[in-house]
């Protein structure tokens, strides 16, 4: 069974320092408290592009679940919706992109 995940892609914020403070001090702790059933959480900061231009996105969050069923149950909960609303509230560069996916991994 493939792992399922929610991927949240945040656009570059209007104020990077204010976003970073809200993300680290408010949002991540809130998400960890409210979003139940995750098997793994990965936060990524986008630091550049291959051509050196400013990237249009600033952060990517990946919330892993053991199955699509577990993800769907979690996503339907009021506590998860509270965390999602907070993600949108702190995203000053525009609404974040939220995707549901199944991970396919190849190991070398």
Regions found by a protein language model. Give the residues of each.
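Macromolecular interaction modules
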Residues: 1-108
């Amino acid at each position: 069974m493939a792992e399922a995940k929610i991927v949240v892609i945040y656009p570059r914020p209007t104020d990077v320092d204010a976003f970073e403070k809200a993300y680290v001090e408010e949002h991540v702790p809130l998400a960890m408290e409210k979003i139940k059933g995750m098997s793994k959480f990965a936060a990524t900061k986008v630091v550049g592009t291959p051509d050196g231009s400013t990237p249009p996105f600033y952060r990517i969050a990946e919330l892993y679940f053991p199955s699509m069923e577990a993800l769907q149950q979690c996503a339907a909960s009021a506590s998860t919706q509270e965390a999602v609303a907070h993600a949108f509230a702190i995203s000053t560069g525009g609404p974040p992109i939220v995707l549901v996916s199944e991970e396919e991994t190849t190991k070398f």
